[in-house]
């Protein structure tokens, strides 16, 4: 299996990338969006019901624009019902929708700022700012791997590697290899899982290490991996499939992104 043949979702379910649930993108939106971001959507629903005139007076043809926005947001989800092509890596293939997803939060924040003279609005705005501050701190902690962000609805941080294929680009591989301290006086046999051997070779050579070979996992002493889904008779993450001792790892906010592991 290639890394795009199967996927892992927030409920620790595995799917073939051609057989993903129709709510796959919605699930990614719920579990990977900032907490304050989701709150603004809930607030907007109440605001639209109770303060619809505010938006109508502020924005020309507001109802039509809102309807168009909703259709744009629904479009990628509807695609999953009709297009047979594989979908993988969360919102990766639908990044063009992100600016549209930001419009509802923008409208909500605009309303709150414009109505700060009211006590209830002030309280809501302060609470929303606290949620944003919580997100922002966590966002900084995971630098430079912001695309691996998972919100609090994913449960314990140390178990979140089982929720999604987090570092699916293998962006942490450079840091992982730079942090490693292996003895290259003798030839080291590496295997990979979830990342390309050629990329690992490049970073090892760039570090000045040349005495190594890449072999199959059964012949390797060490394995370089992310938490991509692999196959050993059943779907399983690379981390869970290959047991051993971590020699080097890249971790952000208690979420392990990649490891070099000595195989037991």
Task: Label each residue range with its predicted role.
Residues 42, 68, 72, 99-107:
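Alpha-helical transmembrane segments of multi-pass membrane proteins
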Residues 8-11, 127-179, 195-199:
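Membrane-proximal, lumen/periplasm-facing interface regions of secretory-pathway glyco-
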Residues 208-264:
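Aromatic/acidic, Gly/Pro-rich catalytic loop(s) in extracytoplasmic/lumenal soluble domains
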Residues 28-60, 108:
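Hydrophobic, aromatic-rich transmembrane alpha-helices
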Residues 13-24, 30-33, 64-67, 80-98:
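Membrane-interface catalytic loops of GT-C/OST-like multi-pass glycosylation enzymes that act
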Residues 49, 53-54, 62, 66-70, ...:
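Signature aromatic-anchored transmembrane alpha helix within multi-pass, membrane-resident enzymes
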Residues 85-120:
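Repeat-solenoid scaffold signature
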Residues 15, 73-90, 137-146:
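Transmembrane-helix signature of polytopic, lipid-linked glycan biosynthesis machinery
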């Amino acid at each position: 299996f290639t890394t795009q043949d199967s996927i892992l979702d927030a409920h620790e379910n595995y799917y073939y990338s051609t057989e993903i649930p129709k709510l796959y993108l919605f699930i990614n939106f719920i579990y990977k969006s900032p907490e304050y971001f989701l709150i603004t959507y809930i607030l907007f629903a109440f605001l639209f019901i109770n303060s619809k005139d505010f938006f109508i007076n502020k924005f020309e043809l507001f109802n039509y624009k809102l309807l168009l926005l909703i259709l744009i947001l629904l479009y990628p989800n509807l695609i999953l019902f009709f297009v047979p092509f594989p979908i993988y890596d969360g919102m990766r293939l639908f990044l063009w929708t992100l600016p549209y997803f930001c419009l509802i939060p923008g409208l909500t924040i605009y309303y709150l700022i414009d109505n700060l003279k009211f006590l209830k609005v002030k309280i809501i705005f302060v609470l929303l700012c606290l949620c944003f501050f919580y997100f922002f701190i966590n966002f900084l902690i995971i630098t430079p791997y912001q695309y691996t962000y998972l919100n609090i609805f994913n449960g314990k941080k140390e178990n979140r590697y089982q929720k999604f294929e987090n570092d699916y680009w293998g962006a942490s591989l450079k840091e992982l290899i730079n942090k490693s301290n292996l003895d290259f006086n003798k030839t080291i046999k590496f295997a990979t899982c979830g990342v390309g051997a050629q990329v690992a070779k490049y970073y090892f050579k760039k570090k000045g290490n040349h005495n190594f070979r890449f072999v199959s996992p059964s012949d390797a002493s060490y394995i370089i991996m992310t938490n991509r889904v692999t196959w050993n008779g059943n779907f399983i993450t690379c981390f869970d499939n290959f047991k051993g001792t971590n020699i080097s790892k890249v971790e952000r906010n208690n979420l392990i992104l990649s490891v070099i592991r000595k195989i037991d």
